[in-house]
């Protein structure tokens, strides 16, 4: 029976770009080292925050190899593989090289808006061919469909290689319902930085974080404090990020965190269309907050 190995701080890695629009592989190397050196427990690559829909297959392959090479097995790697064409996702899983990868993150089918039974059958097909543990990804704000707790738990019970769900419904009631009814070998992972403190307090195993790209040390400390039951110092860290949580997403993701990383000197402030950089006023406000953070 597979066990969830994705606990603590997972960072949803951005993909840095140069001014000419090409992938900035040197900055990506530095960013991976920065994450590992500052408390990231695992890395999540080529998902939404990594702007994967705007990358070529060649770029995705090169990013995968780079992250594996820089990581050298120090932390776990979760790689995205999902879509709204079940057969295509199944074929991609069957035909991909998964060496050096520890798990697959797979989103609920978007745009099609399947029923709960359709969601179950989609993930059943994936689970039956996957050579690696699977983390489900429920994000209704992007997919247009919410996977209900009973569906999540049904999948978890029926397919032991489905080890967790990245839950980004925004509903703490839904999180509690999953945690209450899930099998013992299945975990809930926060997909929302702002709700991570509350979700871990309710029993979540960690987070796949956006803010962790820029502030992994402080965010991982908050999580570790919570795991030890030291809620007051953890709460102080959480509250210090309250305004930043909102600003990071006001102009879209990963525009906010890329602006923050640019301010820190890590990357150029570049995205690929249809995404554009965050507004100047938003960037300036985040810069002010960054300078005042006592972390």
Residue ranges and their predicted role:
Residues 138-139, 161-162, 272-273:
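Glycine-rich phosphate-binding "P-loop"
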Residues 3-144, 154:
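Active-site beta->alpha loop and helix N-cap motifs at the rims of alpha/beta catalytic domains
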Residues 28, 60, 64, 89, ...:
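A general structural signal for well-ordered alpha-helical segments in protein cores
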Residues 1-4, 291:
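Basic/polar N-terminal segments that are highly enriched at the extreme N-terminus
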Residues 55-58, 91, 116-119, 147-149, ...:
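Short secondary-structure transition/capping segments
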Residues 6-10, 45-48, 80, 101, ...:
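Short glycine/serine/threonine-biased micro-segments
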Residues 128-129, 142-249:
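Catalytic alpha/beta core domains of metabolic enzymes, predominantly
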Residues 8-16, 34, 38-40, 202-204, ...:
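C-terminal alpha-helical cap/extension of soluble enzyme domains
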